[in-house]
Amino acid sequence: MPLNWQKEAINDLRCHEKRKAAMESLADEIRELRSRTYGSSAPAADAVPVQGGTSTAEGRWIAAIDELERKKEAYRITKRQVEAVERGLAALDEQQREILDSFFINRVQGHVSALAEKYHVEQSRVYQMKDQAVRNFTLARYGVAEI
């Protein structure tokens, strides 16, 4: 089954603000985990475990390091996705960015009427403009518009 690039592009646009919020949240969580893991309250790295096993504190420390690494990877992936969408949007003109924003990123009720009024066109023309903006964004984002 071939990939529908325009659907992928639309999904990227719809998720854009949520991904930006996730980046902020992940950055906060990473800072908190770093301070907990490597701060003054972290277990001593040279502590000798009792009765030959790993200490409970050491186990928590290892788990915190693992969680920190997973959060950092999630942040890197999310950041790449956000930057790719922003590069795709930057390749468009202001009108196309506004249309995509109104349809997919920050959609509000009455967006088609508002765009038709702003650009002095019929609502059917707004949908045509949206389709062209999606094609251009898809091309800028993925290098292909249709396959």
Labelled PLM ranges:
Residues 1-91, 114, 139-147:
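N-terminal interaction/assembly modules
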Residues 107-125:
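Helix-turn-helix DNA-binding module
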Residues 81, 92-96, 129:
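N-terminal positioning helix adjacent to the helix-turn-helix/winged-helix DNA-binding module
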Residues 120-140:
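DNA-recognition helix of helix-turn-helix
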Residues 92-110:
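Short amphipathic alpha helix immediately N-terminal
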